[in-house]
A protein has these predicted regions:
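Aromatic-rich, lipid-facing transmembrane alpha helices and their immediate juxtamembrane interface loops
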Residues: 1-169
Length: 169
């Protein structure tokens, strides 16, 4: 039951981030994601190591998505400004929420490196496609180019999250 809350809470918060941007409330999603993480920690009595992972990937994830934006292949809507190419808060919130699933609803992926790579390479781009369909991001390059880049980035990121999680534990 706890893992069900974990994945549903993350998914609801993820959609709140995307739809919040679409409808001009770009801070609604991050607030809901913060609430999800607070409730998550009260339910799971998570260890300090999990908090370290979440904070670490708040930074790493923001850097990754900032780098993606700076390649010019996509634009994040709901950003701080169009001139400042830093991934917006709602993207950082998504990274934090995703990391809260690693030791719980996604724990079955631990040490399954090829599966982690495949899951990242497939579902990472699908998340961005959904974000693009709901106008949270705009692709600036061809659909194929954007998705090849995202597949590579997420194919590496998911195993990296699990690897660093194992080192932090």
């Amino acid at each position: 039951m706890k893992n069900l809350f974990n994945i549903i809470g993350f998914q609801l918060s993820w959609w709140a981030c995307v739809l919040g941007v679409k409808y001009g409330y770009s801070y609604f999603g991050p607030l809901l994601m913060f609430l999800f993480i607070v409730i998550h920690f009260s339910i799971f009595k998570s260890q300090i190591s999990e908090l370290k992972l979440i904070v670490l990937f708040a930074f790493i994830g923001t850097i990754i998505d900032t780098a993606i934006a700076n390649t010019g292949i996509l634009i994040y809507n709901g950003s701080y400004s169009q001139e400042l190419l830093i991934a917006p808060l709602w993207i950082t919130a998504m990274w934090c929420g995703f990391c809260a699933t690693i030791n719980h609803s996604l724990s079955w992926l631990k040490e399954k490196w090829i599966l982690c790579f495949l899951m990242g390479a497939i579902f990472g781009p699908l998340s961005y496609i959904a974000g693009e369909k709901f106008e949270a991001i705009s692709f600036q390059s061809s659909f194929l180019t954007v998705n090849i880049v995202l597949a590579i980035v997420w194919g590496i990121s998911i195993p990296l999250i699990f690897f660093l999680n194992s080192k932090i534990q």
